[in-house]
Amino acid sequence: RGICAIPYVRQRDNATVYFPVNIIGNLYVSNGMSAGNTPAEARTQALSEIFERYAKFRIISEGLCLPDVPQAVINRYPRIAAGIQGLRDAGFGILVKDASMGGQFPVMNVTLLNPQDQGCFARFGAHPRFEVALERALTELLQGRALDALGGFPAPGFDLEEVASSPNIEIHFVDSSGVIHWNFLGDQPDFPFHDWNFSGTTAEDYQWSVNAIQAMGRDIYVADFQHLGVYACRVLVPGMSEIYPVDELEWENNSIANPIREAILNLSDLDHDECSDLMET
């Protein structure tokens, strides 16, 4: 029947490349999807999400320790500082960290430590503007949760292999409730603090994001969508924006049931032997 594929435009040379829908659904899921008032705004948000998850997964899986953000820097943003202080006043330990990995990525981290159950809950936010990235990390921490629902997260672990395992990383993608390695809470950061800010106009934010990813040797592919006057896009960066490992295509492929689809759609027409074969399958 052929392969269902969607055209994407490679930003490096404007070449059109077709990506099979099955590969997108298996490996990238919702990562890099965005809508906005303008193409530049939506694409910047999509790339920011890709930056966030790429940095987050590397930091968690490699057990990296991030530098703290000085209080003087946090105080530049009174609303954010007040939100952080409010959580501390409620009895939670709040760590604010620079997740740019040495100024490479526009990513920030806010981590909550619950003294009641020793749970550790780390959230990340990304945007070329430092303030927006920090605010996103803080709001992600409380997204869909009241203060009395900030318990039940796992305590940090010592087994880096477990922390870096695909099931744990998958949980971090779903709701960030996976295990964090104790190294993350250490006092010897793997990178110095960078007081970064890569922001300019919306168009400049997008161009900076593109340049940063292409400087890593990665290609950016964009599919544009318009519906009822609203612009949306989906961005893929092979080697960077995958949520699931390529092995998923072999072991957990969404198309695994294709050979029995016809039988399922015609159950009433199957004879006894065909029903038995389908059940065994």
Question: Where are the language model's segments positioned?
Answer:
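Helix-biased "structured C-terminal domain" signature
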Residues: 1-281
